[in-house]
């Protein structure tokens, strides 16, 4: 997400004059590709060289912000980029925006990427549970030995899984940076990735479940923005509203971690000879 956010903002600032309103959308492609390249580091370390997944992930979490800020200072000679002038904008849904009450809340002056993300979760569910590729991908995370016996290339499928996660993480970071912070700095991506992990666990490793959990965490994050405008929360200090998403993350993990069953081979290196 960090590298995707940096790439998305950099692409936006570089090509906004030549690409116009398509700039933020095309920046998602660039951010996704950078996410894939960065995820390959993790894939090579854990799949090919069988490094510990936690150690490799920790190294990348330390490397990404440091590399991004180094590049920001090298390009802009300061600690953050300039603010972008072109974002995804707001969208009104025809017909739906005319519905009393609900139309004003959900379908008028809203973010289109949010609805695209919801639609994508259903597409991801279909691919994972209803297609041959998805079943193979799940099998190498559940029981790689059995998958190998059936002729499935475990290493290739695991590489595909990591690269897809890098693609989506890069796109997610670019959307976050261009929708909320409108620039990139060291504090642009602080915590959303870990909240995404919590959403995955809360959603029991299902795309639709993770989407619903993300909506829950997103609603808690929005309290920091609009909480003071709500009568029930107007007297609550802003700092408490800002930490609410992370407190809820800890509570959810403590309550549901034992109930959410992860794939049996999650985080376990596969050795073909065993």
Locate the predicted segments by residue.
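Short, non-helical or kinked segments that cap or interrupt transmembrane helices
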Residues: 1-7, 47-60, 136, 180-194, ...
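Hydrophobic alpha-helical transmembrane segments
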Residues: 2, 25-33, 55-58, 115-119, ...
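Hydrophobic core segments of alpha-helical transmembrane domains in multi-pass membrane transport
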Residues: 5-11, 65-69, 114-127, 162-172, ...
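Alpha-helical transmembrane segments within multi-pass membrane transporters and channels
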Residues: 18-65, 221
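Transmembrane helix-bundle core of multi-pass membrane transporters
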Residues: 64-129, 231-241, 267-274
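Helix-loop-helix "hairpin" substructures at the membrane interface of multi-pass membrane proteins
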Residues: 106-184, 207-208, 212
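Cytosolic-side transmembrane-helix boundaries in multi-pass membrane proteins
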Residues: 142-149, 153-156, 227-274
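Transmembrane alpha-helical segments in multi-pass inner-membrane proteins
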Residues: 169, 179-246
């Amino acid at each position: 997400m960090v590298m995707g956010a940096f790439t998305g903002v950099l692409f936006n600032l570089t090509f906004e004059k030549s690409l116009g309103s398509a700039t933020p959308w095309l920046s998602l492609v660039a951010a996704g590709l950078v996410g894939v390249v960065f995820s390959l580091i993790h894939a090579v370390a854990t799949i090919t060289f069988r490094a510990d997944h936690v150690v490799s992930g920790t190294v990348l979490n330390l490397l990404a912000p440091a590399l991004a800020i180094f590049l920001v200072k090298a390009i802009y000679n300061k600690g953050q980029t300039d603010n972008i002038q072109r974002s995804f904008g707001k969208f009104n849904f025809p017909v739906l925006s005319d519905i009393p009450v609900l139309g004003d809340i959900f379908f008028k002056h809203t973010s289109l990427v949010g609805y695209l993300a919801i639609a994508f979760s259903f597409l991801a569910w279909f691919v994972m549970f209803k297609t041959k590729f998805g079943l193979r991908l799940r099998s190498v995370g559940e029981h790689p030995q059995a998958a190998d016996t059936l002729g499935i290339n475990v290493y290739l499928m695991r590489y595909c899984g990591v690269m897809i996660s890098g693609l989506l993480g890069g796109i997610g970071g670019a959307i976050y940076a261009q929708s909320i912070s409108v620039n990139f700095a060291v504090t642009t991506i602080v915590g959303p990735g870990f909240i995404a992990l919590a959403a995955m666990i809360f959603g029991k490793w299902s795309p639709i479940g993770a989407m619903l959990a993300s909506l829950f965490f997103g609603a808690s994050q929005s309290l920091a923005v609009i909480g003071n405008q709500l009568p029930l929360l107007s007297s609550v200090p802003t700092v408490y509203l800002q930490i609410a998403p992370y407190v809820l993350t800890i509570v959810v993990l403590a309550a549901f971690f034992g109930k959410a069953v992860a794939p049996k081979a999650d985080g376990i290196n596969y050795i073909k000879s065993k």
